[in-house]
UniProtKB/Swiss-Prot annotation:
This is Peptide deformylase. The active site is at 135. Pfam families: Pep_deformylase (PF01327). Fe cation binds at residues 92, 134, 138. It is an enzyme of class 3 (hydrolase). Belongs to the polypeptide deformylase family. Its cofactor is Fe(2+).
Length: 172
């Protein structure tokens, strides 16, 4: 297993639309293992392949007690079951140190493949529903900061760009 570098906002590669996985094979299973290792090291509760510059529809989630075991979603699709929404404070490994309230559908159905290529369907609730939607946004080139005002998004962008410049200067 290997730690993968996580892309950070405003890196334009985060806006890439992920392609469906054609075949769940050893290459994809190795990617999944590397993504879990990277997510745990960060530490985080979810990671999309887009965040590690692999533009295929793969995401991993581990909410500890809430999910009982780590979850893998390959080629996920989502169906919104009703119009009820709730707000949740979200953060992101690609937008480190920033948290904002995001409104998302409360009742959803997700269809995906597991790490063995077997289809499954779930109707997640609570944090799992939020996390699945957040990670699926990454596969579509969208970030949680896209849900906040343009002024807030620009402020976050400027702060992260400043942090990147300072980090580059301290290395050089």
């Amino acid at each position: 297993m290997a730690l993968l570098p996580i892309l950070e906002f405003p890196d334009p590669r985060l806006r890439t639309i992920a392609k469906p996985v054609a075949k769940v094979d050893q290459r994809i299973r190795t990617l999944i293992d590397d993504m879990f290792e990277t997510m745990y090291d960060a530490p985080g509760i979810g990671l999309a392949a887009t965040q590690v510059n692999v533009h295929e529809q793969v995401l991993v989630i581990d909410l500890g007690e809430e999910t009982k075991e780590p979850m893998v979603f390959i080629n996920p699709s989502i169906e919104i079951l009703d119009q009820e929404h709730y707000e949740y404070e979200e953060g992101c490994l690609s937008v480190p140190g920033f948290y904002e309230q995001v409104s998302r559908p409360k009742h959803i159905r997700v269809t995906a493949l597991d790490r063995d290529g077997k289809e499954f369907v779930i109707e997640p609730e609570g944090l799992l529903a939020v996390c699945v939607q957040h990670e699926m946004d990454h596969l579509n080139g969208k970030l949680f900061v896209d849900y906040v005002s343009n002024i807030k998004r620009q402020r976050i962008r400027k702060k992260l760009e400043k942090q990147h410049r300072q980090a580059a200067q301290s290395v050089g």
